[in-house]
Amino acid sequence: MLKIEIVEFRRAAVLAILTGCFLFGAAALAAAANSNPTVSIAAGQVQGRLLPGGAGAVFRGLPFAQPPVGPLRWREPQPVTPWKGVRDAGESRPPCAQNSSGWNAKEAAASREDCLHLDVWMPQWPSKSPKPVMLWLHGGGNTGGAGASDPLYEGTSLISHGVVLVIADYRLGIFGFLAHPELTRESPHHSSGNYAFLDQIAALQWVHDNIAQFGGDPRNVTVFGQSAGSMDLSVLMTSPLSRGLFHRAIAESGAAGRATPLADAEQAGQRTAGTLKAPAEEALAYLRSLSTADLLRGGRGGTGAVLDGYLFDSDPSAVFAASKALPIPLLIGSNAIEMSDAGSPDALRATIQARYRDLAPKALALYGVASPGDKGSIDPVYGGPNDQWGADIGFRCPGILQGEEHAAAGFPVWEYQFDRAIPPKPNVVHSGELAYVFGNLRPTGSQAGEFGEADRKLSAAIQKYWTNFAKTGDPNGAGVPNWPKYDATSRKFMEFTRAGELAVNENQRRAFCEVFAEAEKASRANR
């Protein structure tokens, strides 16, 4: 009997210990959960995560609009439905629906239509004073890529300079840019095709309404972006719906281009609908019934602004030319080499002749392909003639012209050129500056490299310039060389050199870009 009692006692003791451990563990988990930062915003409470080492906090996967699915596919972003309780904000959400083009295979595999989310990175928790806000728009040709879920844009390094970082996703391809007469008719604004831009404005409106709860200053918002993101923010600078929502802009490798008239965009949308086998009547109901995969297989839609009389009532490039863009400071630039046309010199000559027409002889001489058999000029910074043409026509010269026209309107402009190749690559490429801007110099990932001390110093300088600009509207400040404003006489710009140094230079590709500007202005006059 005594033995049985001892055994029972031991069992009870072990059970008590296990129960105590379980309760202690549960309490510890609850305490850990409760230590995570919680914020109340317009739609409800959200709980983020503290960053290691007291580096601040991050709130991931915050919806800034209702999911644009079902009847909300191809509609303006709608306000978020409020929720009860505390919403977990510990994970970024997948990118917006897209087809794979190889470079974005990972993003395409994870993508979905329910994608209107953003991440917020805070440099302090709790916040002690309002901080400048930087909202990032990713690149990808407006057909691919990711914002918040891309580790390249991890924000710990950038926010250490005292800014709040917001990374937003927006609809892409056919989901973001399809115009169609039926969509225009159902719109209260008689508009269609600009859904991606409306998403970006909705994200900015969310920042305006909620960012103070995360320690951000809604009166000091900088939009910055690269490639398509840079083009988009430049276009937003020409929309009346953007006024008051952002106060500075950083455009990396992208400028405002031409917009498509609504009627032309609608016709393109009807062709897309036909490809998807939509009926001539009630095509919209049919298109909304299709799966995401069906739409991705059968259609692309446009990739740029539509002149709808609501979001855009004038061609964006013409708005800059008329000095009517948002009256805000602009920091703009491109990479020495962006995207190269791999064709032959003879093919390049034909391309230049078709693009520049009467101005072609001048351009052909500059690129060294004036006559059949010419191999073209090789530049130690800008590469061969195809490298030069690809960057000049697509990125560099449009950006220089946009900066010049914005400066002529009396607004402060700073221009740059980024030359540094990610080691051990031989040359800089399109998007090659991103690892430096975000301070994510890593041996793995989409911008992996064998980074050294020169790269770390260059990244630190770029981050200071970018965040100084976000704080004051001027990139200059303690610890970095003076960066002169752009002016039409000397055309000074900051060059981030191949060696990783900082150098002020003048007249960036002036002769080449003057030909571009002359051709562009003539084209505007004929539109």
Task: Mark where each language-model region is.
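Bacterial N-terminal signal peptides
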Residues: V14-A26
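Surface-exposed patches in mature extracellular/periplasmic domains of secreted proteins
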Residues: R219-V221, A278-Y286, E415-Q417, G477-P484
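Non-catalytic accessory segments of hydrolases
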Residues: A30-N194, T444-I462, A470-N482, G500, ...
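Substrate-gating cap/lid region and adjacent catalytic-acid/histidine neighborhood
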Residues: Y286-A454, Y465, T472
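N-terminal secretory signal peptides that target proteins for export/translocation
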Residues: M1-R11
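Serine-hydrolase-like catalytic core of hydrolytic proteins
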Residues: S100-L284, D313-G343, A408-F411, A503
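Short, solvent-exposed turn/loop segments enriched in Gly/Ser/Thr/Pro and often Arg
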Residues: R171-I174, F224-A228, Q417-P424, P481-D487
